[in-house]
Swiss-Prot record:
CDD domains: Ribosomal_L22 (cd00336)
Organism of this sequence: Trichlorobacter lovleyi (strain ATCC BAA-1151 / DSM 17278 / SZ)
Gene Ontology annotations of biological process type: translation
Protein name: Large ribosomal subunit protein uL22
Subunit comment: Part of the 50S ribosomal subunit.
GO MF entries: rRNA binding; structural constituent of ribosome
NCBIfam families: rplV_bact
Protein task: This protein binds specifically to 23S rRNA; its binding is stimulated by other ribosomal proteins, e.g. L4, L17, and L20. It is important during the early stages of 50S assembly. It makes multiple contacts with different domains of the 23S rRNA in the assembled 50S subunit and ribosome. The globular domain of the protein is located near the polypeptide exit tunnel on the outside of the subunit, while an extended beta-hairpin is found that lines the wall of the exit tunnel in the center of the 70S ribosome.
């Protein structure tokens, strides 16, 4: 049985978040939670909360053994980019880009590819 969780418009860079997501892809749920809990990245804390949400969704669906769950798919897509301007010298302005991410996690209890 599969369970999923999604997060839209997270104020994280997709490029930096993908590196953390690659660490837990395909791993067991306990190993993934332990890995994310010891990483100092802000994106690791967001992914940790998202994984816990997916586990809670699995419990609501009636999965009996949570320890058999593993991260089937996890992917990070780019979201809308917030654009801000900063005043510069001689009346100019520079653009500041604040990227956002859409993160999706799917947990499964059977290892079928």
């Amino acid at each position: 049985m599969e369970s999923s969780a999604k997060l839209s418009l997270a104020r994280l860079s997709p490029r930096k978040t993908r590196t953390v997501a690659d660490l837990v892809r395909g791993k067991g749920i306990q190993q993934a939670l332990n890995t994310l809990s010891f990483l100092p990245n802000p994106s690791a804390q967001i992914l940790l909360k998202l994984l816990k949400s997916a586990v809670a969704n699995a419990e609501q669906k009636g999965v009996n053994d949570i320890d058999k769950l593993f991260v089937k798919t996890i992917f990070v897509d780019g979201g809308a980019v917030l654009k801000r301007f900063v005043p510069r010298a001689m009346g100019r302005a520079s653009k500041i880009r604040k990227p956002t991410s859409h993160i999706s996690v799917v947990l499964s209890d059977t290892k079928t590819r």
